[in-house]
Amino acid sequence: MTSTASSSSRIVTDSPIVVALDYHNRENALAFVDKIDPRDCRLKVGKEMFTLFGPQFVRELQQRGFDIFLDLKFHDIPNTAAHAVAAAADLGVWMVNVHASGGARMMTAAREALLPFGKDAPLLIAVTVLTSMEASDLADLGVTVSPAQYAERLAGLTQKCGLDGVVCSAQEAVRFKQAFGEDFKLVTPGIRPQGSAAGDQRRIMTPEQALAAGVDYMVIGRPVTQSEDPAQTLKTINASLKGHG
């Protein structure tokens, strides 16, 4: 089984930057995308945009050469999650995610659903603890350990299930690399260049700090999408990361 994404339009990038597309308007999103270069980043499409504009929007981004992280955080019974992940793979996305709190059977089913896709399978990542969550939020759910402890517990379960990595906060990255190894990919939201506002992400870090901490892919949103010159902003961040590599 192979994905439907066109390999001829895909442009390979070695940038760790994933730009979060958080737009309410399709035309505005595409106008932004047409200002940037797929060699400088990948793109993340989340629940709102995918619900509004559907798979065809993902295809339009792919036709422009971009790798897509489909950030839908599947969390369901194992069979349903597996079918959803397979549908994402058939769409040809570069990365897809599930909630680790869905449990081992769900994550294993999702991983096994990607086996028929072979080398065309997307990276399968699990969400540990959302970056907006604090200890008090977890306590409301009956979780008495800290966000960092809970994230590490879920990351360990994710690795046991054979997934490619986790979404985690940058503060957890150093420990996770030590605990789970270099091949276990770390995807981190809440990354903001120096001087950017924190927004609704509580646990934040600069791109240079994230790279030094062991983050493999860093999700950056408004500091790029709201920049007066997003193409130059991306080039500046990439250059700063190469300088720290």
From Swiss-Prot:
Substrate binds at residues 22, 44, 71-80, 131, 192, 201, 221-222. Pfam families: OMPdecase. The keyword Flavoprotein does not apply. The active site is at K73. It is an enzyme of class 4 (lyase). One of its GO terms (biological process) is 'de novo' pyrimidine nucleobase biosynthetic process. GO terms for molecular function: orotidine-5'-phosphate decarboxylase activity. The keyword Lyase applies. It catalyses: orotidine 5'-phosphate + H(+) = UMP + CO2. Keywords: Decarboxylase, Lyase, Pyrimidine biosynthesis. Its EC number is 4.1.1.23. Pathway: Pyrimidine metabolism; UMP biosynthesis via de novo pathway; UMP from orotate: step 2/2. GO terms for cellular component: cytosol. Belongs to the OMP decarboxylase family. Type 1 subfamily. HAMAP family: OMPdecase_type1_B. Homodimer. Catalyzes the decarboxylation of orotidine 5'-monophosphate (OMP) to uridine 5'-monophosphate (UMP). This is Orotidine 5'-phosphate decarboxylase. It comes from Escherichia fergusonii (strain ATCC 35469 / DSM 13698 / CCUG 18766 / IAM 14443 / JCM 21226 / LMG 7866 / NBRC 102419 / NCTC 12128 / CDC 0568-73). The lineage of its organism: Bacteria, Pseudomonadati, Pseudomonadota, Gammaproteobacteria, Enterobacterales.
